[in-house]
Amino acid sequence: ALARLAPNGIDYFYDTVGGEILDLVLETINERGKILSVGMISQENGKEQYPIRNLRYIAAKSVSIHGFIYWHHLKYWENGELDNTVRPLLEKKEINYREQVFEGVENTPEHFVNMVNGKYAGKVIIKIADL
């Protein structure tokens, strides 16, 4: 499926899932590809740990994997550097993102299940009030 969706391979991958998804990406990622790992939701909640089978591609393709946890970088938010750097990129559409907004806190369980099951792409937002 990834070969069909990314016929030229993958250069950058933002990983929030880990497990089988990471394994598939390692097969498809291009030489010198970069992976930013910000979470491994597939490995949480007492699930059996998925053994990554394609680790050999990290060396064979010179892939870089970097872990990232936001609280290690709060100083950039607090001093305004993040906003000064990222906002112009968003305004010039040099950074693309997807978000899906749903209304009503009563719908949260349904959308959470759909999100975890991969039915949504991008950030899922539940709007509970107009501010």
Identify the residue ranges that each predicted region occupies.
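Terminal helix/beta-alpha structural elements that buttress the NAD(P)+-binding lobe
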Residues: 1-131
